[in-house]
Amino acid sequence: MATTSDLRTNMIIRHNGQLHRVMEFYHHAPGNWRAMVIMKLKNIETGKTIEERVRAGSEIEIVRVEKRPMQFLYREGDIYHFMDTETFEQIEVAEDLIGEPAKFLKENEMADILFYDDNKILGVEPPLFVTLQVTEASVAVRGDTATNVNKQVTLETGAVISVPAFVNQGDYVRVDTRTGEYIERIK
């Protein structure tokens, strides 16, 4: 067993029988009381965020997470199909396990599948940045504004993001999959 001194941000721990991601934590020593560690935890299954206080030095159970790079093959309804490029083993992942980044998964691209406890799927981490083609964009009118203006565009995966007015249909853009924000236009 590990102690609270082993905590790290984004670590997966088992707390009260459920898996949680450590969003943030800090050590607190109030006057003449015993020191404590205050953790902000996000439940993996429900997505609910809680704040938990434990004594400094108390034991915590760290869940060993294994990352395996796999190729995204295709989507069938709300099931995503991935393949291990070394063993050619295929797995199915439900859309709710992937979460928001699902809208940035492009066929034949690589993503990291997170496993725990004898090959149970914890989630999917797509690449931090993806390059996608703009399939739908409204036309920007010259002289329309005096300041920076963004417009909504639809990408080839169906995701809708906000981009600067100079981005047109058919352009390629780089997107941050963690936030869903436009980074740059690719020439």
From Swiss-Prot:
Biological process (GO), any one: peptide biosynthetic process
Top-level taxon of the source organism: Bacteria
Family matches, as InterPro entries: Elong-fact-P_C, NA-bd_OB-fold, Rib_uL2_dom2, Transl_elong_fac_P/YeiP, Transl_elong_KOW-like, Transl_elong_P/YeiP_cen, Transl_elong_P/YeiP_CS, Transl_elongation_fac_P
Pfam entry (one): EFP_N
Pathway: Protein biosynthesis; polypeptide chain elongation
Protein location: Cytoplasm
CDD domains according to UniProt: S1_EF-P_repeat_1, S1_EF-P_repeat_2
Record PROSITE patterns: EFP
MF-aspect GO terms: translation elongation factor activity
GO cellular component, one term: cytoplasm
Record keywords, A-Z: Cytoplasm, Elongation factor, Protein biosynthesis
UniProt record similarity statement: Belongs to the elongation factor P family.
Role: Involved in peptide bond synthesis. Stimulates efficient translation and peptide-bond synthesis on native or reconstituted 70S ribosomes in vitro. Probably functions indirectly by altering the affinity of the ribosome for aminoacyl-tRNA, thus increasing their reactivity as acceptors for peptidyl transferase.
HAMAP family: EF_P (MF_00141)
Protein name (Swiss-Prot/TrEMBL): Elongation factor P
Gene that this sequence comes from: efp
